[in-house]
């Protein structure tokens, strides 16, 4: 149990005809945040996402990296008890990927459970202390990171 911040599919919870500003409030509401809370965190969300000059542009004009940055910024504006991220570190430029990785590590250090989905074995080794290896929807192995990653690579 806990408040969950999911980032499962790029653009889910967004309206591509609305601006970035409007989508902060839409996506935040979907995640259960009040308008007042989002107003108090608005500047932080925009600053972390690094899309300030495009905040009043409709999302249909955003790159996939910009959408991912906005989604990640909204999802992590509070410390969720559970954060679900699907390939978030593979979208956007290298600087934002590193910034996102650091934010996830901070959240994990603060007690957030992160369910991290990735095909990048190096990211899995760096981010995880337990791993579930799934193949075609079936659990192949569950255990400590190095054991599972070694089996997967072997």
Please describe what each predicted stretch is:
Residues 76-85:
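A short, proline-enriched helix->beta-strand linker immediately N-terminal to the Walker B motif
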Residues 118-119:
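H-loop/switch region of ABC-family ATPase nucleotide-binding domains
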Residues 25, 37-54, 71-73:
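Conserved ABC ATPase "signature" region
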Residues 136-137, 152:
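Conserved ABC ATPase "signature" C-loop
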Residues 124-126:
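A short, surface-exposed alpha-helical micro-motif characterized by mixed small hydrophobic
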Residues 1-28:
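ABC ATPase nucleotide-binding domain signature region
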Residues 142-143:
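ABC ATPase "signature
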Residues 97-110:
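Helical segment within the ABC ATPase nucleotide-binding domain
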